[in-house]
């Protein structure tokens, strides 16, 4: 019977599964967007939301608890300094899952899992790229094409 059993096994041992999700949470927080299979993304959403909620508390004990799942100190600092401030007003639901189709090799359903408020970090880069394109000199107009004439038939030799 499957009473009170929470989570997916994903055909892995307990140690492999926990290590995989710790690595995936770290990657998600570092890059703020990763591509994975849909069942892994759904399970990762639970892990990531718990870690971000701990970071919002901001206490030393919360940092120790988050350090169990996020072993990279650089990512842990990013979580507590920038991401906790970004999600301070949001009561939950820090991640979004978008299905992107199927993988070519094994036809597994793939999804993108990303942090919800990642637009502020990407907006300045997009504006800079737009300004660079506008600064380029306009291209010269193309010369009009010559009219096409039918090819002359070769004169028959008599």
From Swiss-Prot:
GO terms for cellular component: cytosolic large ribosomal subunit. InterPro entries: Ribosomal_bL17, Ribosomal_bL17_CS, Ribosomal_bL17_sf. Residues 126-158 have a biased composition (Basic and acidic residues). One of its GO terms (biological process) is translation. Coiled coil: none annotated. One of its GO terms (molecular function) is structural constituent of ribosome. The keyword Iron does not apply. The keyword Transport does not apply. Keywords: Ribonucleoprotein, Ribosomal protein. Belongs to the bacterial ribosomal protein bL17 family. Part of the 50S ribosomal subunit. Contacts protein L32. This is Large ribosomal subunit protein bL17. It comes from Anaeromyxobacter sp. (strain K).
């Amino acid at each position: 019977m499957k009473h009170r059993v929470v989570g997916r096994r994903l055909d892995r041992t307990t140690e492999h599964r926990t290590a995989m999700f710790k690595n995936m949470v770290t990657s998600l927080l570092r890059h703020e967007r990763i591509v994975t299979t849909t069942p892994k993304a759904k399970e990762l959403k639970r892990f990531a939301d718990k870690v971000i909620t701990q970071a919002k508390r901001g206490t030393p004990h919360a940092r120790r608890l988050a350090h169990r799942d996020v072993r990279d100190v650089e990512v842990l600092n990013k979580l507590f300094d920038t991401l906790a401030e970004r999600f301070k007003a949001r009561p939950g639901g820090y991640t979004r899952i978008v299905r992107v189709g199927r993988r070519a090799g094994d036809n597994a359903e793939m999804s993108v899992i990303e942090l919800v408020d990642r637009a502020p970090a990407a907006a300045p880069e997009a504006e800079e790229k737009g300004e660079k394109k506008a600064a380029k000199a306009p291209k010269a107009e193309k010369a009009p094409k010559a009219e096409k004439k039918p090819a002359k038939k070769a004169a028959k030799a008599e």
